[in-house]
Amino acid sequence: MKLIIAVIKPFKLEEVRDALKDIGIQGLMVSEVKGYGRQDGHSEVYRGAEYTVSFVPKLKLEIVVADKDASKTVETISEVAKTGKIGDGKIFVTPVEAALRIRTDEKNDDAI
């Protein structure tokens, strides 16, 4: 199993979720996060005063998939979340040692 962590622009969430459903990915976790990379924040004007926003709001998606589904999941997120502009996000893939569905005690691939 793999844990796929994707950091994307918030307005891309629905499109990414729908695309993942289309390839059979049934669940994901979403968290609101803030961060910076090459984008390095931006300036905004509020009530006539300019403010520097150091951290950019993003969404973090966490998806556990079977090994056989990892490449297609990453490819789908990348294709759908891409705008071609700085700040599109990142995708990380890490191994998952075990999974357990609490309600049924199903384990590993059966639990996801």
Regions found by a protein language model. Name each.
Residues M1-I112:
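Positively charged, small/polar-rich N-terminal and surface patches that mediate targeting and assembly
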